[in-house]
């Protein structure tokens, strides 16, 4: 979400979010004057908060109450306000070191095993973030690519078909790349182009793990077909990861008791739906947290933050999910994440998730 805020609006939104995260109480201008050195009067803060409310970044839960951040307000906070000028970098660095130190200490006193490593990581992640921690088991025996084919279904519409080594078939329907559909090319020309791109995919991916698809170097595709490469890159990776979910998706879950003490989870029915998701619908959750973000450097962990209604799974549309992928040799093996109320400490959660993903990547390398 791109919203242009003045420096004053940024600082007041930042202070409002930080105060609400800390107190779970609607925030008024008086509290901000007392707690933060914003350099403006209470009346000015009220006016700015009114502007932020009209922009959809804050709202009043009750007429007489202060204001709280909306999902959009949290999104601006995460994307634009957690920057070196506003972020407590020392604090996040300390948290990252705590994760690494705690994991090293945990392994020092235990006989090293995969289960012990991941259980320890899940518990440490929950303790440091105050959230539910989620860690997927590494996918070491995934299916591989047998064949990929692009087929023209009708004018302007194509289908990507993936066949695995076990002959499972997966498909994705999509429009032609805009650069090709705008010129209204002859269908026979499109068929030939799709076959050339299909040949490229098969020559580079046949026999490789589905999880390796994200490492494909699309720059090797002939220049005249680069419009397909740019368009298909995410679609091919998305289809592969959607197909890679194992029959038994195991997710280690820790920290449930702690996070359910938060006021946001006071409704019993909401708690039940979250527990049901964690216990009975792990495949849906696995697919969500194992979605692969586009990375420039596949050896570094990128943290994905989904806030409130950005989550496609209904039971957690009032929660925030922060996740990252751990890898071996640049190939994704599994994911780590934390789940909590939208009113969570994003800086801490992002720091510990990134640190845990990096540590596990090193452990598996």
Curated annotation (Swiss-Prot):
A Pfam family per the record: HrcA
One BP term from GO: negative regulation of DNA-templated transcription
Keyword Membrane on entry: no
Superkingdom: Bacteria
Transmembrane segments: none
GO molecular function annotation: DNA binding
Disulphide bond pairs: none
Keywords: Repressor, Stress response, Transcription, Transcription regulation
Functional summary from the UniProt entry: Negative regulator of class I heat shock genes (grpE-dnaK-dnaJ and groELS operons). Prevents heat-shock induction of these operons.
Family of this protein: Belongs to the HrcA family.
The name this protein goes by in its record: Heat-inducible transcription repressor HrcA
Organism of provenance: Trichormus variabilis (strain ATCC 29413 / PCC 7937)
UniProt gene name: hrcA
